[in-house]
Regions:
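Glycine-rich phosphate/cofactor-binding loops in nucleotide/flavin-utilizing enzymes
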Residues: 1-39
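N-terminal glycine-rich FAD/FM-binding segment characteristic of electron-transfer flavoproteins
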Residues: 31-218
Length: 218
């Protein structure tokens, strides 16, 4: 068989070889009636499921931020209430996360400011916690880290690696801010702004800052 896998097994010092042939059937779909493979006929769905994928492009950065805030409020997000930034990720209803696009550690203050204005807990991608060590390991979100299932996730400078997207696939609303318009996160978000986090985050923080937050209902 062309698709067979041949495994050589050595037994003891005599190196007696046995050939085991196993057909590779997983992932090999039959042909459709039209002659095209089913896998080619149907594109894979986004990792985070069906999303709005609304990217705000009109006007300058300030207008894009205002359009984003208006959309979030229209969806029912109330920014007069909030949770502590150190709330455990699995228990948080809102999370603002930093990716490597945040740059130097001093720029984490922008993420913290947005988390406070949003009334959200703070999180990160795996490299930010594990490699850069900007946050403790229990703050990174992903398949091998914390799972977020709350109502609002804001990804700041996160490109959208598969393992990260699988950690947020059950979020109600995903917002992406990244200067790379081709980043996978934009195919897996509800709302997005293609822009530099250094410019967008201060604008978004100012737009959402409604003063002291009331405790979010349990």
């Amino acid at each position: 068989y062309r698709d067979a896998k041949i495994t050589t097994i050595y037994e003891g010092t005599n190196e007696i070889q046995r050939v085991v042939i196993a057909s590779h059937l997983i992932g090999r779909l039959g042909k459709s009636s039209g002659g095209e493979s089913r896998s080619a006929a149907k594109k894979p769905a986004p990792i985070t499921g069906i999303r709005k994928r609304t990217i705000f492009r009109e006007g300058d950065a300030a207008q894009q931020v205002n359009d984003l805030v208006a959309a979030l409020k229209k969806d029912g997000h109330d920014f007069s209430v909030g949770i502590p930034m150190d709330t455990p990720i699995p228990k948080a209803e809102r999370v603002v996360s930093a990716g490597k696009g945040i740059g130097e550690k001093k720029n984490m203050k922008l993420v913290e400011g947005l988390a406070k204005a949003t009334g959200a807990a703070i999180g990160s991608s795996r490299p930010v916690a594990e490699t850069l060590k900007y946050l403790p390991l229990d703050r990174y979100v992903g398949m091998s880290g914390q799972k977020f299932t709350g109502n609002l996730y804001i990804a700041c400078g996160i490109s959208g690696a598969t393992q990260h997207l699988k950690g947020i696939k059950d979020a109600s609303t995903i917002v992406a801010i990244n200067k790379n318009g081709n980043a996978p996160i934009f195919k897996n978000c509800d709302y997005g702004i293609v822009g530099d986090v250094m410019e967008i985050l201060p604008l978004l923080t100012a737009a959402l800052d409604s003063g002291e937050k009331q405790p979010a209902p349990p």
